[in-house]
Amino acid sequence: MSPAVDTASTAKDPISVMKSNASAAAADQIKTHEYEHLTSVPIVQPLPITDRLSSEAAQKYKPNLPGGFEEYKSLHKESLENPAKFYHERAQLLNWFKPYDQVFIPDTEGKPTFENNAWFTNGQLNACYNLVDRHAFTQPNKVAILYEADEPGQGYSLTYAELLEQVCKVAQILQYSMNVKKGDTVAVYMPMIPQALITLLAITRIGAIHSVVFAGFSSNSLRDRINDAYSKTVITTDESKRGGKTIETKRIVDEALKDTPQVTNVLVFKRTHNENIKYIPGRDLDWDEEVKKYKSYTPCEPVDSEHPLFLLYTSGSTGAPKGVQHSTAGYLLQALLSMKYTFDIQNDDIFFTAGDIGWITGHTYCVYGPLLQGCTTLVFEGTPAYPNFSRYWEIVDKYQVTQFYVAPTALRLLKRAGDSFTEGFSLKSLRSLGSVGEPIAAEVWEWYSEKIGKNELPIVDTYWQTESGSHLVTPLAGGATPMKPGAAAFPFFGIDLAVLDPTTGIEQTGEHAEGVLAIKRPWPSFARTIWKNNDRFLDTYLKPYPGYYFTGDGVARDKDGFFWILGRVDDVVNVSGHRLSTAEIEAAIIEDDMVAECAVVGFNDELTGQAVAAFVVLKNKSSLTAASESELQDIKKHLIITVRKDIGPFAAPKLIVLVDDLPKTRSGKIMRRILRKILAGESDQLGDVSTLSNPGIVKHLIDSVKL
């Protein structure tokens, strides 16, 4: 390969304000690790699937890539060299109300471009029809949703016919009781229950746009997302259940809506039937009462291929959450293809994604992907630790799950709990295991393979993002690609990866490469924009390295062609697979009257992958020396509670360090790199600190962390 960016163009200053931060962080990260050992990690070939199946099941099984790795390489090459042909053939897997004119808007070489990123132009379809109607017509009694409630033994199933009826009734509530129109945004703040999926499907059925907010966010965060999307309608529950605890979702919504004047209606599903929940007449509607008013069928609204399907807010390095906007046709197709090929989905499969619909994993691989394929999706309301650490494996055996997809954080928790919780379960129904949200450490990968996969199952260690909509780098189940413990492996179809030098932007070639991960051209499910802020979309993703999509992650490629994801190189922390903006957390802390300055960074954590650390300077600096230890602890607890209330419990700092000052350059910029190094125990590897205006602060910071 030859460099895609010439030295003349890369010698200029970057046009994005964030490139200097990203390149410095990436360069620092790369210098502090040795990645040459990755090549020595052994390649693992899973046992052929037919060897693990009964003779009857083996006869029925038809792999989606029967030609294995060679077929993958051939199809991947075709998806890059002839994308129009590749995607046109596979677009027939969707049902269209109106055929499209062309697959994408091509450049002079017949390839898609970031500048004109539109797919299946002038075609019309409907997401809900593709997820529900077509399967309800052909296999009405097939189970679409299996629901496992927080409490064991509670739950139920919905067939595709039953799902269609419930979706149609909620769609009519939206249209006629709540006056939701095509193109309106609808905010969804719900737990992992079937009604959450029904809600999303009903919204898409009428051509509206869903904006799901994770039901762990605070009222302030919910308010900000409702206002940014200008949602006039909110759908929620009275309460929710998780890990044996009750969460007051309706109360949180009510608090958020004190500052959302545009909201006219709230639809409430009664999950717990708590009679003490307050309802506001004229605004709040009872789900159970409303569904009684409407008939069991209403037609779908055709929408253009590029019609916005949903918004999903993700953390940004500048603090304010970004409403990532996905279009309909391209997202649907790539979600379907990733289900088909990554997981080697068969029609009778039961797919269990242990992820929340408040994040992209729940969107693509709990809702859209499985239902597009016409298989069964399992919705789990609870946690892996309630009522005990065997819960996941009980569910797998109970429902005969065929694919299990989970974040490494949960696996680390279960590994730490002890192997006894994995014993006594068959797990024979499983055909593949998945990992999502963050890189999985080799030792966790090996535990997952041995204890859950019996050293027989493929582990698809998937790398992707809210912005990508579906998998970017992943092994393929069904024995289609080899694996290495801890490696994301190979690019998915349509994904043209590049490893760039973080400073120059020049593509790194050769057997071994390290740098930042970028992508050379768009793919169907690539996000179209940031809601109402396309300039921010360009500045964040396309301007840091012109001609490329900048993922924000560091990467290494070994001599065997495997890609290894090395973590964030921007000011985003990945905690338990959740991307959190350090700037947003800093803003929450600085709002407190006692705080003068704050710098938030991530540090390695054995359980959550990364954790949040906040270095805080108080306005009254004398209190650091005058206060007792218990008073200092009270200050720290107060600041943690502040973040929990302003953003959500999952964003709370694990470590707060009260300091006299922060390390700053002469221009006043905080050198967060120094803070990260100190937390990593690398105080002897701080690098160039000559630009510090207060070099004496370094020893104070080191001593403060040790306390």
From Swiss-Prot:
PROSITE patterns: AMP_BINDING
GO cellular component: cytosol; endoplasmic reticulum
EC top class, as a word: ligase
Main location: other
Binding site for CoA: 242-245, 361, 576, 644
Positions that bind ATP: 437-439, 461-466, 553, 568, 579
UniProt-listed Enzyme Commission number(s): 6.2.1.1
Full protein name: Acetyl-coenzyme A synthetase 1
Organism lineage string: Eukaryota, Fungi, Dikarya, Ascomycota, Saccharomycotina
